[in-house]
Amino acid sequence: MMKGSPSVPPAGCLLPLLLLLFTGVSGEVSWFSVKGPAEPITVLLGTEATLPCQLSPEQSAARMHIRWYRAQPTPAVLVFHNGQEQGEVQMPEYRGRTQMVRQAIDMGSVALQIQQVQASDDGLYHCQFTDGFTSQEVSMELRVIGLGSAPLVHMTGPENDGIRVLCSSSGWFPKPKVQWRDTSGNMLLSSSELQTQDREGLFQVEVSLLVTDRAIGNVICSIQNPMYDQEKSKAILLPEPFFPKTCPWKVALVCSVLILLVLLGGISLGIWKEHQVKRREIKKWSKEHEEMLLLKKGTKSVLKIRDDLQADLDRRKALYKEDWKKALLYPDWRKELFQEAPVRINYEMPDQDKTDSRTEENRGEETVSSSQVDHNLITLSQEGFMLGRYYWEVDVKDTEEWTLGVYELCTQDASLTDPLRKFRVLEKNGDGYRALDFCSQNINSEEPLQLKTRPLKIAIFLDQEDNDLSFYNMTDETHIFSFAQVPFLGSPYPYFTRNSMGLSATAQP
């Protein structure tokens, strides 16, 4: 220190002097701390969140300056000063959604209440009390959970010898976890996953799965919030007819080509070894130089043949793969595996009196089971379908009401004059379509259907080996409906009328 300079107290002594000066002016100094919840506060999206904070020790905070803020003190989430809330310094996104709970403010207990919680409200909050020169605060975390919509699962079509399945959902926060699994709980690897955020910060997910194992049957799409135990899931059935079936002649062709390639490879290897021997002999005997040239030409010829065969094989593979993909989209490919049913269709509506007065000669010509319903317009030239695969087509272009499919006897009880019949049919009534499975008065299943194109001709495929009955719209060659994995108890018969069944939950067929 220089001589003559006034003595200056050390900086460490200034704070106690200021406190003593303030004590002398005000007469008292406020000492306190602020406490808040130790664990994060978790609320659902769109509900109400309450963030409490408490002075310790307990004392009145009515005359204090209280501020809740996020990253920066200004602008604030909410400011309480001079006994009222100060809206002019509030963040715009919180206006009209916040209020201070102050019933216990005289004991130093207040809370910030946020209504209609949004995804942007998620994060850290600070509760600050200021009394004169004393200011203390506490931090707390608000976790917002958004449970999105139920998954939408559908098949997008065949791809690479399998079926691609797509699962989508929206309204999640934070980013959800998406999994595929089979009915046994085994996890399946997703082919692709896309997650995007909308303007409100909510996540939309879209994942796809390529199923090549036809034994799986069902797959389940499960979506779960990482901070919430509850999950939302949706299962989808993968029908066997949608999987591509391997043609024996194609397998034989591929095997033959592979064997040919192996043989060519063996021939090429033998030629290469012989070529090496010739090269050693040429070094010893120069007179055999011409023979070496001929051998090289032969080798090039064989290699060219092999390359040509490989190119032709690749071209055929590409053509077969393209044809197979196209075949899956049309019912015609199924006709290659099914035999045409020996049926006869009478497109004129039979008269009741004429039906009752049919001669025995006509009955002998039809050779139809006596249990066939009276108004059936389609007859089979045998006693029911034998075990196998059959298809037939029905023209329905001039009919506003019709029912077609198959039926079988439910019972062979001799005491019943009219044996019970089980129907699996497709029905049209006006503009409405539905698939029905019923026996007598009992409707086993009813499925309303939406068809983009009105069918003028319908093809029915009966597969007794795989227990499958499928209907195709031959107008646009699209699949309508399938009764899958439902066993046939007896010999089925074809069925077609120009009327709807008129069935409800209590009606009798």
UniProtKB/Swiss-Prot annotation:
The chain crosses the membrane at residues 251-271. Residues 316-509 form the B30.2/SPRY domain. Residues 272-509 are cytoplasmic. It is found in: Membrane. Its main location: membrane. Gene3D superfamilies: 2.60.120.920, Immunoglobulins. It is a single-pass type I membrane protein. InterPro entries: B30.2/SPRY (IPR001870), B30.2/SPRY_sf (IPR043136), BTN3A2-like_Ig-C (IPR053896), Butyrophylin_SPRY (IPR003879), ConA-like_dom_sf (IPR013320), Ig-like_dom (IPR007110), Ig-like_dom_sf (IPR036179), Ig-like_fold (IPR013783). PROSITE patterns: B302_SPRY (PS50188), IG_LIKE (PS50835). GO terms for cellular component: cell surface; membrane. Residues 351-366 have a biased composition (Basic and acidic residues). Belongs to the immunoglobulin superfamily. BTN/MOG family. This is Butyrophilin-like protein 1. It comes from Mus musculus. The lineage of its organism: Eukaryota, Metazoa, Chordata, Craniata, Vertebrata.
